[in-house]
Structure formats: structure tokens, C-alpha cells
Amino acid sequence: MKEATITPFAKPLYIMTKPVGAVCNLACDYCYYLEKSKLYEEQPRHVMSDELLEKFIKEYIQSQTMPQVLFTWHGGETLMRPLVFYKKALELQKKYAGGRTIDNCIQTNGTLLTDEWCEFFRENNFLVGISIDGPQEFHDEYRKNKMGQPSFYKVMKGINLLKKHGVEWNAMAVVNDYNADYPLDFYRFFRDELDCHYIQFTPIVERLSNRADGLRLSSLKQKDGELASFSITPEQWGNFLCTIFDEWVLNDVGNYYIQLFDSTLANWVGQQPGICSLAKYCGHAAVMEFNGDVYACDHFVFPEYKLGNIYQKTLVEMMYSKEQETFGAMKHNSLPQQCLNCSYEFACHGECPKNRFMLSKDGEPGLNYLCKGYYQFFDHVAPLSLIHISEP
């Protein structure tokens, strides 16, 4: 790889890896990724080969311009790949590190965690993300296995194992039409019962449609689509954030970290947010499927957003392609005038493009479905944010 090819790129190249594609032991009602297996129905086994694993790790490390390299293992359910696979991955990372520091994080539903897994994560300094949607009543509403059985107790068992072995972990919670109505019960569960100090709240918004490729979820390019019943409303989202923020800012700042709150403050002071949905541009976080196909984003795994395959193109060629550049710039360039005139445009930059399927007040396309909720939240926190900025 030529030096001149990659030196202009100041940001780390970042690609999430799907070692088992969309394969999962759960069948959560709202999951946006389960159906992606339909894109690969002609392939009997949706598992990453050792050959591809080595090719990806070598090229991914050698494509970086920074001394730190982050590997993110995502699913499907990542732990459906045996432990030996990840041991092999670490061996390959060491083989090709070339003096770079390698970090690993892995997202899991937690139900398959064992002492052996947790010992491995602790010994190798993995950051483990656990998907859990709050207390049992909230979590089990949508997060069930393929037999329709609830998963809460198995997830809690997994969390307790992580704690037992001293594994660093955080929580990723989907906020839906049900649990959004109980923000304090929701937040206090993570704080008081789990003592989870790093929490990510993700609002679920999906549209259902009939696609020729068999997928039921709408892509951004589809103008039709019926809002899925589990989707949160803008009003719910705004009330949810404001209610939790009021509790958090009085008692928990500096001790419990909520990603969206931290990212909002970052935008307020002119820093890069820690979450892509609130950044000005997209395109910095692609995803690679089990067979080497690379897509523009984890939420845009549709044929129309495929960048290529690692066996036909290099990661640098795909990540810095005209297609990916256009995809990334689209987030800002397609904002309707209502957003550009908004006092809080700097705080959300239109949020995630996948949610921008509404018409603005002037009839322009591209308004975010959650706009009213975000505006309510930003308006609520603005006085405190300004006070924080003015402090010496």
C-alpha cells in the first residue's frame, strides 16, 4: 500500500466486524439486523473464515494512520462464534500490530457469557457492551429468544459474571414505545441496580415496507413505509431525555456517563461528539459482513449501500471512495432549510440520516422524525449548557 494513499486521512479508519453476520440466539422484535441474513440466503454458513479473519486484521491494521487501532466485534450475536476464533484474532493482531496499540470491544446480548468467556475478556482487556433494555418488565417486552421466551434473567446472569471477573463493560439500551414512558424507572435501574457507569440510550425508529430483496425494513432511499409499532414517538423521546437529564445533572454528573448527554455537551463546546448520529458528517463507521462485504454503515446494510468486498477492493479504496464520501456528506448537504435555520442545528446536525424521512414545514424532504423530541431536549438543557461553557 502506497504511503501517499493513506497519509491525508487524519481520522482512524473504522470498520465494525460481523463474524457471524446476522446470526443470533435471540429474536428481538425490533432488531434491525436479523433480517440481513436474507441477503446471503445462498450461503449456507454465515461465519467468517480464518482466511478472511487474517486478511481483514492485516489490512485493517496496515491501513491505519494512528498508533491506536480499535477492533469492534458486532452481531448478530458475537458469542455464537467460539472462543477459539477470538483467540486466533488476538494472535493475528499481535502478528501484524507493527508497534501499534490494539484495543478490542465486543457487543453481546450477554446470554451466552460464561466464566471462561469473562476470564478471556478480562485477561485481554476487552470492553464488553451489553444489550439490556432496563428492568425485566421493559427488557422482556421485545427481547425474547426464537421460542418466544424472555431473556432478562440470562442477561443478568451474564452481567454478574462480568462483574465477578472484573471485566470492563457498559450498557446499550434501546428506548422503544413501551419503556420510554418510564424514564426514571429505566435510568435508576442502570444506576442503582446495575451500578452501570456508562450507558448508551438508542431510540428505536423503523419503517416497514415490501422490498424486492425480501427485507422488510425501509432504507433511506425508500419514500414509502409504515412506522413500526415499537418505534418511539418524538414526544416520548423528548420527555424521556429531559426527565433523565434532570435527575442526572443533580446527582450523577462525573460518576455516571450517558453517551448522548456527553455528546450533546461536546457539540455545545465545539468538540467532536462521541456518537456518530450527532456528528456533522457520516461515513466514518462502516461494517464488514462475515463474507467480506463492506457497507457504508451498520444501519445501511442494504444492497444499494454496499461499497464492495475486501477480496475485490482494499479497505482504503472502499472507505475513501467517492461513494462513501458522498454518503458521509449527504448528512449535512441534504438538510432542509428548516434545519439550517434551527438554533440547535449545531447540536444534532439532523441526527441519523436513517430517521430523516419526514417533510419540513416547507415541504422539503429530510426532516428527522425525532426532531421535536431533540428540540425539546436541547431547549431544556440550553441554560445549563451555557452556564457550563461560561465557567472558568
Regions found by a protein language model. Give the residues of each.
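Local cysteine-cluster metal-coordination motifs and their immediate loop/turn environment
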Residues: 23-33, 296-299, 336-354
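Canonical Radical SAM [4Fe-4S] cluster-binding loop centered on the CxxxCxxC motif
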Residues: 9-51
